[in-house]
Amino acid sequence: MLTEVQPATQKFPGRFGELVQFPLQRIHIELTNVCNFDCTFCPKQEMTRHYEYMDFERVCGIIDEIAEYKMAEKITFHVMGEPFMHPRFFEILEHAAERGVKTGITTNGTYLDEEMGIKLEKVTASQVNISLQTPDEESFKTRKS
């Protein structure tokens, strides 16, 4: 007779209850909703909140909690804004690396150059996704601000 073994469900104080199984594959964090593009398909035109950057201490606190409770295999930085625009982005990546948390980044690629590549290698970002939303240079120009 085969017995199905269910993965252990961990309880987290006051937030998740017993229904969420950890670790998650990834947790997405929006460091900023500021972006250097003005894409026609982006819902930011409908956004009513102010453009801002997440507070460094808050981000570090979230990373600490994810590391302490082993909540996810990886944190991915993206959502509405361009993560490279956060003024303390590399400090945030360093903080995650020091806590043993793998990081992924989704970017529009405009900040990627040789210098950024060297910095990314030092902070051991485990994944960099470049979001290419256009098939050619002409359509790219229409979405870039």
Question: For each of these PLM feature ranges, what is it?
Answer:
Residues 130-132:
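Conserved phosphate-donor/acceptor-positioning beta-strand/loop module used by diverse small-molecule
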Residues 1-128, 138-143:
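Conserved alpha-helical substructure of the radical SAM core
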